[in-house]
Amino acid sequence: MTIGKALIHRLQTGVPGLDEILGGGLPEYSFNIIAGSPGSGKTTLAHQMMFGLATAQRPALYFTVLGEPPLKMLRYQQQFDFFDSEKVNHSVRFFNLSDDIASGDLVQVLKRISSEVERHNPALVFIDSFRSVILAERSGGNSFLGLQQFIQQLGTLMTSWQATTFLIGEYFAENDPNPVFTVADGMIWLRQSVERNSVVRKMEITKMRGAATLAGLHTFRITSAGIHVFAPPQLGADSGADSDSTSPALTRLSLGVPELDEMLGGGLPRGYSLLVAGPSGSGKSILAGAFLTEGGRRGETGVIAAFEQRPNRSRGGAITELIDSGRIGVIDTRALNMSVDEIAALLIREIHRLKASRVVIDSLSGFELALAPTFREDFRESLARMISALATTGATVLMTSELEDRYADLRFSPYGTAFLTDSIIVQRYIEVDSQLKRVTAVVKVRASNHSNDLRLFDIDDDGIKIRQKLVGFEGLLGGRPTRRRGLRDPSADDA
């Protein structure tokens, strides 16, 4: 006899990013633990899921066993955007088990829960805090076996009632000898750590039966909207990017500087990533602004994450107009203690929302400083993952990187990430006849011919102007070029 495979329906939690790390949602009728230290966000997560899932056809019961009345808890939870007062006492009902717990009689506690569940027939049941049940049982003198039997009976009853259940508790370590961990189908562990003045919240799905969850710790943030989980960007096979990066007929995008497009071999190939590296004030942000402005002129949309100054400053009025009209999306980088996964998620969301073809990250140096200290340690690996994820969107990405002008050390990124990008443009300062001049060159364009010239360039009110290439000089990359004997200064042609 052939036994058909049982299909598990997955509930969409309503918590941004959580369904992704759960592997597609929460298994219906599962018996789950939401664990963590005090203040880690357990009750907020439970309420956000409850209000997101509860409907008239799928009602929820929330049992509180805390010493404080539900009204006090609701006073704080209703400050969040997800709180829906119209659902209270209709699709969402609260019950206080404090009196039942005080006796330490688990039979009475189970009887009370059973009676309310039978009366209201909920699809969702929450018990907060379940650790209070454990402490009350121990203080009441009952045996550890009694607690284990209570948990097993509760799990069996919830399954027979076809209710998806959540036990919320203050647990500090997964290896505690606690019977509830064995019975649970799923465990969502919330953590928070403090390093210097930085507070970082992380979530881990330590257990979820029947689900291929995303392993590891995932950062999340609590705002007025509630909890937002930032799953690591997924490197899917399907993307809008050009799948054949070696194709000789690549579609090209203009950077907004015609001469620089020529140096690139006709523009930047669509879907490529470009690193613009140079010292402070060399014109990196201006080039980034020209890239976005040119896209706007051609009817394209873009996204910018500016970490050093507001996007509408130093990039001209055209950028401000594009932002105000909604054709350029701006990533808010003012939040403290960000993670690379958070910024990547915000970028990808904006790219999909606007169907953006151009993305600017200005700059990687500011990007690193915006991160919580714990995330700076693996910045290179996280950045590599983010660049790969952005490539799957099909957008063309321009990143800037500030370098110290060390002329004895030719580097294009302080993070050793230059190899991750498809193309590199370098900007440098040189001294000629006691004057500071700017030069630029295209270092690489993957699978494409490009100019090898070092070209002078100026910056005026209209942006970047590429001048002639430097001929008759030696030691340009050393910062102090010397003119070959008998050759005049070619830059004098523009004087």
Locate the predicted segments by residue:
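Conserved P-loop NTPase
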Residues: 2-4, 8-9, 111, 118-120, ...
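Pre-Walker A adenine-sensing motif
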Residues: 14-25, 256-267
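Scaffold/interface architecture of coatomer-like assemblies
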Residues: 23, 31, 36-38, 45, ...
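Short glycine-/polar-rich loops that comprise or flank the Walker A/P-loop
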Residues: 29, 56-59, 88-92, 161-163, ...
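P-loop NTPase motor core
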Residues: 32, 102, 107-183, 187, ...
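Conserved P-loop
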Residues: 37-101, 269-273, 279-342
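Short beta-alpha junctions and helix-cap segments that line functional grooves
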Residues: 49, 170, 174-178, 189-192, ...
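Conserved nucleotide-binding/hydrolysis micro-motifs of P-loop NTPases
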Residues: 66-71, 98-103, 130-133, 165, ...
